[in-house]
Amino acid sequence: MKTPEAPPLAPDCLPSDQAPAPARLSRQASPMDKNTDPELMPTPRDGDDPPQVSSDPMVGLALSQELEEGVPASLPTPLESGFGSPSELSSRVEEKELSENVSLPAEETNRPELGPGEDVEGVSEELTPEDEGYTIWNYNFSQVPRFLSGSWSEFITQPENFLKGCKWAPDGSCILTNSADNILRIYNLPPELYNEGEQLEYAEMAPVLRMVEGDTIYDYCWYSLMSSAQPDTSYVASSSRENPIHIWDAFTGELRASFRSYNHLDELTAAHSLCFSPDGSQLFCGFNRTVRVFSTSRPGRDCEVRTTFAKRQGQSGIISCIAFSPTQPLYACGSYGRSLGLYTWEDGSPLALLGGHQGGITHLCFHPDGNCFFSGARKDAELLCWDLRQLGHPLWSLSREVTTNQRIYFDLDPTGQFLVSGSTSGAVSVWDTGGAGLESKPEPVLSFQPQKDCTNGVSLHPSLPLLATASGQRVFPEPTESGDEREEEVDLPLLSMRHVHLECQLQLWWCGGGPDTSISDAHQEEMGQGRTEGGGGEFT
């Protein structure tokens, strides 16, 4: 099937008539970067014993006391600005455009100029969002989200293709997806959302950029300070098997830089997890019992090696996910060894080692207040909430269905009130973290079924009440029932996929309330997806 022609990327979130001309990217895998530097990097110490995770409820007291006494007032000093450092606004955002987007009240425009020394009385220095003409949107999960648009034709061109998560850009201008065909795709925010009034019909979304990796993509992430108004901050990092870490330009899709890691045999090793520091100065990468820290101002092989397991103590296994606290100078690491570790940002000193999951950790997320963080694991039906002030045991747990080794994402809204998670069964569940109270197992406030296939990715928009979901999973043929031995048909397949529901698609849902909260039959038939129960979803 021919891929629809991609519309231009609107970097500054302006209507399409003000967006710059698009840039094309050929669908070719980027060659592996060559390295000529003979210098070897330090290697982690050997050790195969599991981490010494104490069951004592006093585990983590050291960190708790440190946080109670107070933390350093300043974060690590950002390094010299490089390819990903913010700079002045792009010249493409003209002064005229900026002035058109801000309207002053009539009182301000008609007010005469004040002479020197005249007192200003009754003038409010701060304008409210209503005065500036902005609309404040909040997430509302009192009713089932309304389906807006999605992309499905893009992923059916290859057999057995499926999505592997989705992530909104920090500025909300576009969304990034990963799929089993080793292609990263960027979609613009649907142009219908820029129109005033309620838009009931949305066209199918088409990617504006495709970035092809050479092998299975392990992890991907946006630059933490990404803003479409500043093109030099619009970057995406990705890591794939037997390849260096690639930095892609989110405007053109071109490869802009590479970070390479080598083992003790000077062999290239791939990172299993990626995370930019909050100030954008560093890129943290997870390896086997090691975290390597690259400076974003110096692409190449130079990095700081932070070993997480030494002398048969510490956090063993592959570091599968990394997350930074938004308020404290520390970060959390999850490993496939079923352990969680907390480390200082400055030098990686260990603060606490936690255990409690039944499977390898696949995703971490900090609450915006910085006091709590959430963890999820593969083949584990629990999402655990941890309080940094009392790390002896989880604060509470949330139940979700995860029966495979696939990474099932979850996300928090910008206020931290709602937590949304996918599941192997396809159901999307929403919990109110503010109303959890002292309950050990809070129940979801809403649960709905976007499709029958696995919902592996969820991402909440940073400023609009938009929920993005990604679906699909790797499926294996099931044995067929044997028929009569006297049947003459001998070419019947021994394995069949007739009972498998393949629904690989990206979907956008409006979570701000509205008159119509059901998925239309026309969209259901066009996408080939299963209908939800109860007119668009099922309340819990």
Curated annotation (Swiss-Prot):
One Pfam family here: WD40
What spans are recorded as compositionally biased (Acidic residues)? 116-126
The WD repeat boundaries are: 158-197, 213-258, 263-304, 314-355, 356-396, 402-441
Q: Which residues carry this modification: Phosphothreonine?
A: 480
**Where do the record's region annotations for Disordered lie?**
1-126, 520-540
- SUPFAM superfamilies per UniProt: WD40 repeat-like (SSF50978)
- Quote the cellular component terms of the Gene Ontology held in the record: Cajal body; chromosome, telomeric region; site of double-strand break; telomerase holoenzyme complex
| GO terms (BP aspect) | Cajal body organization; DNA repair; positive regulation of DNA repair; positive regulation of double-strand break repair; positive regulation of double-strand break repair via homologous recombination; positive regulation of double-strand break repair via nonhomologous end joining; protein localization to Cajal body; RNA folding
The entry's keywords: Chaperone, Chromosome, DNA damage, DNA repair, Nucleus, Phosphoprotein, Repeat, RNA-binding, Telomere, WD repeat
**GO MF term set:** RNA binding; telomerase RNA binding
Bias-annotated ranges (Gly residues)? 531-540
Q: What is its main location?
A: nucleus
Which residues are recorded with the post-translational modification Phosphoserine?
Answer: 26, 30, 54, 64, 85, 90, 482
Where does this polypeptide localize?
Answer: Nucleus, Cajal body; Chromosome, Telomere; Chromosome
Q: Post-translational modification, briefly?
A: Phosphorylated at Ser-64 by ATM in response to DNA damage, promoting its interaction with histone H2AX and localization to sites of DNA double-strand breaks.
Amino acid composition bias (Pro residues), ranges on this chain? 1-10
Asked whether the keyword Nucleus is assigned, the reply is yes
On subunit structure and binding partners, the annotation says:
Component of the telomerase holoenzyme complex composed of one molecule of TERT, one molecule of WRAP53/TCAB1, two molecules of H/ACA ribonucleoprotein complex subunits DKC1, NOP10, NHP2 and GAR1, and a telomerase RNA template component (TERC). The telomerase holoenzyme complex is associated with TEP1, SMG6/EST1A and POT1. Interacts with the chaperonin-containing T-complex (TRiC) complex; which mediates the folding of WRAP53/TCAB1. Interacts with COIL. Interacts with SMN1. Interacts with RNF8. Interacts with histone H2AX.
Q: Which family does it belong to?
A: Belongs to the TCAB1 family.
Q: Which PANTHER family match?
A: TELOMERASE CAJAL BODY PROTEIN 1 (PTHR13211:SF0)
Q: What exactly does this protein do? A: RNA chaperone that plays a key role in telomere maintenance and RNA localization to Cajal bodies. Specifically recognizes and binds the Cajal body box (CAB box) present in both small Cajal body RNAs (scaRNAs) and telomerase RNA template component (TERC). Essential component of the telomerase holoenzyme complex, a ribonucleoprotein complex essential for the replication of chromosome termini that elongates telomeres in most eukaryotes. In the telomerase holoenzyme complex, required to stimulate the catalytic activity of the complex.
Q: What is this protein called?
A: Telomerase Cajal body protein 1
Q: Which organism is it from?
A: Bos taurus (Bovine)
Q: Which gene encodes it?
A: WRAP53
